[in-house]
Design a protein with these regions (language model features):
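Hydrophobic, membrane-inserted alpha-helices
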Residues: 2-11, 24-29, 89-93, 153
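Generic hydrophobic transmembrane alpha-helix motif, especially the helices
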Residues: 31, 46-49, 53-60, 66, ...
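Transmembrane-helix boundary motif in ABC transporter permease subunits
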Residues: 8-18, 24-38, 49-79
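Alpha-helical membrane-interface segments at transmembrane helix boundaries
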Residues: 37-45, 49, 72-75, 79-82, ...
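Glycine-rich helix-loop "coupling/hinge" segments at transmembrane-helix boundaries
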Residues: 96, 125, 170-209, 228-234
Length: 234
């Protein structure tokens, strides 16, 4: 508990100084002092893995589709379509394919969280001024070199803001995954709904999940603001 807690506070200090360190540490401290710390870590581990894969998927797909106007409109329409689905619908196909396992929950979380990651990648890359595209092309760089040196660094702050949505989507799906059996906070939350007097426990654990989201949000927003200052982006 102690090592993980100080590791999180250290990340806050490195990214945003003492202010971010205290905010993140204060949010996580509430969870660390409870008896549900181990379950919270399982939730965080599952969400971290899902967010990492979703971010990679979103960056790859978004970068390919942001190249022209037609593919941009198509992928954004697809994102709109999948975001209108009730979140638990994503569990149905993975249960049919992989059965009732934690793997099914992870796959559903990755699929669900890839939507905002893709959307924000497309929007971030499309927001890069066309004059910079032209300058890169005139200097003789390839499309890949232009993406690495110009487009992606400038779009990264916007992409990182989309990571907030990716984290929220992943946590939401993982908590819902308790419907088919997981050992994280979601299992206790779902179980509290059917127990007399369990509403308080369910509400408390819901707050714990929101604290995880708020801690990640603080780290991402702090880093993004600093990055925007370095790039001179308003």
């Amino acid at each position: 508990v102690v090592s993980t807690f100080f590791l999180i506070m250290g990340a806050g200090y490195i990214i945003g100084g003492i202010r971010s360190c205290l905010i993140v540490g204060g949010l996580i401290l509430f969870i660390a002092l409870s008896e549900y710390w181990n379950r919270a870590l399982i939730t965080a581990y599952m969400a971290t893995f899902a967010v990492g894969i979703s971010a990679i998927n979103g960056i790859i797909v978004g970068s390919l589709c942001a190249r022209n106007e037609i593919s941009t409109k198509i992928i954004l329409s697809i994102c709109d379509f999948f975001q209108t689905f009730p979140s638990f619908i994503y569990l149905i196909p993975v249960i049919l394919l992989f059965g009732i396992t934690d793997t099914s929950v992870m796959i559903a979380a990755i699929a669900y969280a890839s939507v905002p990651a893709t959307r924000y990648t497309v929007e971030g890359l499309r927001s890069v001024p066309s004059s910079l595209h032209d300058a890169g092309s005139m200097s003789g760089v390839s499309n890949l070199q232009r993406w690495i040196s110009i487009e992606f660094p400038l779009a990264l702050p916007h992409i990182m803001l989309g990571l907030n949505q990716t984290v929220i989507f992943a946590l939401m799906m993982i908590v819902l995954g308790a419907l088919i059996g997981t050992e994280d906070l979601g299992q206790i939350i779902m179980g509290s709904l059917s127990r007399p007097g369990g509403a308080g426990i369910g509400f408390t654990l819901g707050i714990f999940v929101s604290f995880i989201c708020l801690a990640v949000d603080n780290l991402i927003r702090t880093w993004t603001d600093e990055r925007k200052k370095l790039l001179g982006i308003n």
